[in-house]
């Protein structure tokens, strides 16, 4: 979980979960859907689904719309998984450097 510190910084204490892991573990496995099967049902290349579930590719807007339609979820659900994953990875990798390099400014209310 990421928690905002009082000074505005972030404490990052959980591992990033790739959207492909969610797709694989929470949707494909319980429903018995293969990579090839999902690719056929979504009308996308097998390589796209394979790369996503093997956590080598992210979810695009096009893929999010297709997954949302197929699994009766929302495109926002899939895009938010991707956004959260990327932000958490970047916080873990670069936040301390960014905090040192970038001066904070506030807008007067």
Question: Where would I find each of the regions flagged by the language model?
Answer:
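Hydrophobic side chains within well-formed alpha-helices
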Residues: 19, 74-75
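Short alpha-helical DNA-recognition segment
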Residues: 32-51
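Short, charged recognition helix plus adjacent turn
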Residues: 69, 79-109
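Residue-level detection of the helix-turn-helix DNA-binding "recognition helix"
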Residues: 54-56, 83
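Short, basic-rich loop-to-helix N-cap that marks the start of a DNA-contacting helix
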Residues: 56-69
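N-terminal flexible/basic segments that precede or flank functional cores
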Residues: 1-25, 30-31, 97-101, 109
């Amino acid at each position: 979980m990421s928690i905002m510190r009082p000074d505005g910084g972030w404490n990052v204490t959980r591992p990033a979960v790739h959207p492909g892991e969610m797709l694989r573990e929470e949707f494909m496995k319980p429903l018995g859907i293969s990579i090839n099967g999902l690719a056929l049902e979504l009308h996308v290349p097998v390589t796209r689904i394979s790369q996503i579930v093997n956590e080598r590719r992210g979810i695009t807007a096009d893929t999010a719309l297709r997954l949302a339609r197929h699994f009766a979820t929302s495109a926002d659900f899939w895009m938010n998984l991707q956004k959260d994953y990327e932000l958490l990875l970047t916080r873990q990798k670069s936040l301390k450097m960014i905090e040192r390099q970038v001066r904070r400014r506030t807008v007067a209310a």
